[in-house]
Amino acid sequence: MKEFESIINTAWENKDSINGQSDKSILDAINQTIELVDKGELRVAEKNGNEWVVNQWVKKAIMLSFRTHDMDSLSGPYSSWYDKSHLLKGKTANWTKEDHIKAGFRMVPNSPVRKGSFIGKNAVLMPCFVNIGAYVDEGTMVDTWASVGSCAQIGKNCHISGGAGIGGVLEPMQANPTIIEDNCFIGARSEIVEGVIVGEGSVLSMGVFIGQSTKIVYRETGEVIYGKIPPYSVIVPGSIPSKDGKGPALYCAVIIKQVDEKTRSKTSINDLLRD
């Protein structure tokens, strides 16, 4: 692993010259790193105690892979597609029924999952999209038309509701991935982007939008924070009046309370869907 890290970091310094004809050691390091991410044996980010540590070299390997693979086409019964060759067919293109049983997650038709992403056991993928580098942990549901962006990290037993978006890091290029910790509920059509961290057990209502510059306001105290939602927070969309009271109000996210039993009863996952 350390050898891969060293090779990829060196290659990154000369990324403009990297291509499919580069030294075999570089190509092998990139491809094997993506294979390890695909298997869940390596992650773009992992939690160490209370802090998330980003393996920047893994993210670099993913980005370099776009330079080392040529474009290719894929034809289907009703359309054709044109993309980088290592991503065209997706994670499960050559899987047998036994492979699906071993992986242990549900995946309905029209739920593309890209090679180089990992899905944990008992997860449920409705017609959604999971991009390269993403990690979706055990028991999580990604609902219809939701998207999990490149390198995003989703914890255990989360619910990513219909049409929600968890932002990626490849474009625009971000330093850190967006992270949703264990047991979170992300409401329909919400967007969490730009490396924001949603703390464990938090509940976001429908239509909450949070990036690094979004003000997150404690309703009780008026305190404003950025970029990280504390664990077990209940978040709704809100607005902050202009200072002079004449200009337009600006959007914010509001922490209205800590998660309680009433909230949990409304947002708990359904084990019947994960058998």
Swiss-Prot record:
<keyword id="KW-0028">Amino-acid biosynthesis</keyword>
<dbReference type="GO" id="GO:0019877">
    <property type="term" value="P:diaminopimelate biosynthetic process"/>
</dbReference>
<dbReference type="Pfam" id="PF14805">
    <property type="entry name" value="THDPS_N_2"/>
</dbReference>
<dbReference type="GO" id="GO:0016779">
    <property type="term" value="F:nucleotidyltransferase activity"/>
</dbReference>
<comment type="subunit">
    <text>Homotrimer.</text>
</comment>
<keyword id="KW-0677">Repeat</keyword>
<dbReference type="GO" id="GO:0005737">
    <property type="term" value="C:cytoplasm"/>
</dbReference>
<protein>
    <recommendedName>
        <fullName>2,3,4,5-tetrahydropyridine-2,6-dicarboxylate N-succinyltransferase</fullName>
        <ecNumber>2.3.1.117</ecNumber>
    </recommendedName>
</protein>
<feature type="binding site">
    <location>
        <position position="106"/>
    </location>
    <ligand>
        <name>substrate</name>
    </ligand>
</feature>
<keyword id="KW-0012">Acyltransferase</keyword>
<feature type="binding site">
    <location>
        <position position="143"/>
    </location>
    <ligand>
        <name>substrate</name>
    </ligand>
</feature>
<comment type="pathway">
    <text>Amino-acid biosynthesis; L-lysine biosynthesis via DAP pathway; LL-2,6-diaminopimelate from (S)-tetrahydrodipicolinate (succinylase route): step 1/3.</text>
</comment>
<dbReference type="Pfam" id="PF14602">
    <property type="entry name" value="Hexapep_2"/>
</dbReference>
<dbReference type="GO" id="GO:0008666">
    <property type="term" value="F:2,3,4,5-tetrahydropyridine-2,6-dicarboxylate N-succinyltransferase activity"/>
</dbReference>
<dbReference type="InterPro" id="IPR023180">
    <property type="entry name" value="THP_succinylTrfase_dom1"/>
</dbReference>
<keyword id="KW-0808">Transferase</keyword>
<dbReference type="InterPro" id="IPR011004">
    <property type="entry name" value="Trimer_LpxA-like_sf"/>
</dbReference>
<keyword id="KW-0457">Lysine biosynthesis</keyword>
<dbReference type="InterPro" id="IPR005664">
    <property type="entry name" value="DapD_Trfase_Hexpep_rpt_fam"/>
</dbReference>
<dbReference type="InterPro" id="IPR001451">
    <property type="entry name" value="Hexapep"/>
</dbReference>
<comment type="similarity">
    <text>Belongs to the transferase hexapeptide repeat family.</text>
</comment>
<dbReference type="InterPro" id="IPR037133">
    <property type="entry name" value="THP_succinylTrfase_N_sf"/>
</dbReference>
<dbReference type="GO" id="GO:0009089">
    <property type="term" value="P:lysine biosynthetic process via diaminopimelate"/>
</dbReference>
<keyword id="KW-0963">Cytoplasm</keyword>
<keyword id="KW-0220">Diaminopimelate biosynthesis</keyword>
